[in-house]
Structures are given as C-alpha cells and as structure tokens.
C-alpha cells in the first residue's frame, strides 16, 4: 500500500476557517473520494501547529494498493475536476498557499 499526501501549506484568510472546511466537505472531498482505485481517503484540518513550523491548515491522504492504482487515480476525471477547482479555492480562502505532494509507504 502507498499513500499520496497533499499538504496545503499556508494561511487561511481571517474568519474563513469554517467556510474553508465547509467548502472542502461539500465540493472537494466528494471528488477526492471518486479518485480511481482509492482504498482510503483521509482529510485532516490543522488544529494545533508547531510555533516554529509552517502553517498547515489542510492535509489530504489517499491510499492506493500500488503505484499502478495511484497512476490511474491521477488520470481519473475526478482528479482533473478537483484540480481545476483549486485556483478558486485558493483565492477564496487563503492569504497564501503552497501545495506539496509526498508519496509514502
């Protein structure tokens, strides 16, 4: 099994934390759950941050059986749809944001 993590590093606009979570739950998470070959989808929200580290308000972890399954997910229509929503998501809810991806066993 491998897990692909999407880590949203940045600052949510003041007062937009609840709205950001609601948007993720209503718009992005249903798409992420449609990724081909996904075995488990976990969405996590930052609650407590290391004072010396970067702000991470949102993390996504999707687990696949293997790299072939992950490749199918990255080429699935739901992935492209969710990716196309990200610029508007960033503009609406973030002061600044960088999206990082890591694949872990």
Predicted regions and their residues:
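Active-site-adjacent beta-strand/loop module that shapes the phosphate/pyrophosphate-binding cleft
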Residues: 59, 63-65
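Active-site-flanking beta-strand signature of metal-NTP-handling nucleotidyl enzymes
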Residues: 2-11, 59
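Short amphipathic alpha-helices within nucleic acid-binding modules
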Residues: 18, 65-77
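Glycine-rich beta-strand-turn "strand-cap" elements at beta-sheet edges
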Residues: 39-56, 82-105
């Amino acid at each position: 099994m491998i897990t692909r993590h999407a880590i949203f590093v940045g600052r949510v606009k003041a007062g937009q934390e609840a709205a950001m979570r609601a948007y993720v739950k209503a718009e992005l998470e249903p798409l992420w759950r449609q990724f081909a070959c996904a075995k488990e989808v976990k969405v996590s929200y930052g609650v407590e941050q290391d004072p010396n580290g970067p702000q991470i308000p949102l993390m996504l972890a999707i687990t696949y059986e293997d790299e072939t399954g992950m490749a199918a997910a990255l080429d699935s229509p739901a992935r492209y749809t969710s990716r196309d929503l990200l610029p508007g998501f960033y503009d609406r809810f973030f002061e600044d944001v960088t999206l990082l991806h890591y694949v872990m066993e």
